[in-house]
């Protein structure tokens, strides 16, 4: 009697994750960084797909100054590289992923300008796409910095999954940009559309970074979105106690 052979395959093993983004702008190879073999993890989400479909209906004037904010792995930057956008992110990993994905398409080094959230944005922004971050403080910081560059003709879009878009999110766009509405959900993703209101140009000062002084005398400055911004966390406190002076 022949022996029975049982083959056990680990979950996800041998399955290639989806890396082909299909959008009205074309088809693009977009990969996560670091690389993953999990088939359910892509370098983009339904909100990226949604906003790219919407952008395809906007005047594709390449003379517009496009700005993309919080593009996790560069999917939007790659798809819109022909518009030579500025990509703003607070993540070094995001910037490295964007460079790697642009290189896959042999895009020129200057096809997308990469800036951090602390860098000065372009003086004029004609089209703005903001992927809504999980941290409301980061969104507020970013909108405050971007608002002076917007004008009445600017196209302003927010994009995110339904779990990241709340009433407080819409209120922030309304207060810092202008009249705001949201679209119906598609594959659990929504878009936010805002019309720039000149009255919001004077929305008040941006919230500054918080700071405090340690018992040892060091001054700690915490920018928006950093972990444990209000106080030093226990792990860091323990580490500092044992660092050589």
Predicted regions span which residues?
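Conserved SAM-binding strand-loop segment of SAM-dependent methyltransferases
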Residues: 107-117
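Conserved SAM-binding motif I beta-strand of class I
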Residues: 85-90
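SAM-dependent Rossmann-like transferase core, predominantly class I methyltransferases
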Residues: 34-58, 187-245
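N-terminal auxiliary segments of SAM/dcSAM-dependent transferases
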Residues: 5, 12-22, 134-215
């Amino acid at each position: 009697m022949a022996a029975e052979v049982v083959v056990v395959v680990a979950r996800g093993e041998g399955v290639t994750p989806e890396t082909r983004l299909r959008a009205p702008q074309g088809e693009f190879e977009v990969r996560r960084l670091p690389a993953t073999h999990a088939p359910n993890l892509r370098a983009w989400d339904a909100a990226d797909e949604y906003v790219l479909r919407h952008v395809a209906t906007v005047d594709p004037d390449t003379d517009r100054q496009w700005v993309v904010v919080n593009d996790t792995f560069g999917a939007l930057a790659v798809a819109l590289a022909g518009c030579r956008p500025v990509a703003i992110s607070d993540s070094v990993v995001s910037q490295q992923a964007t460079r790697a994905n642009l290189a896959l398409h042999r895009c020129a080094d200057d096809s997308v300008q990469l800036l951090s959230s602390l860098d000065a944005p372009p003086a004029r922004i004609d089209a703005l796409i903001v992927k809504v971050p999980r941290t409301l403080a980061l969104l507020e910081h970013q909108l405050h910095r971007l608002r002076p560059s917007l004008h009445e003709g600017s196209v302003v879009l927010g994009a995110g999954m339904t779990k990241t878009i709340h009433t407080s999110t819409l209120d922030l766009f309304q207060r810092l940009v202008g009249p705001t509405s949201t679209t119906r959900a598609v594959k659990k993703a929504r878009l936010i559309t805002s019309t720039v209101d000149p009255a919001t140009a004077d929305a008040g000062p941006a919230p500054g970074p918080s700071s405090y002084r340690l018992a040892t005398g060091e001054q700690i400055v915490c920018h928006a979105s950093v972990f444990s911004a209000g106080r030093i966390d226990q792990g860091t406190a323990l580490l500092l106690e044992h660092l050589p002076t």
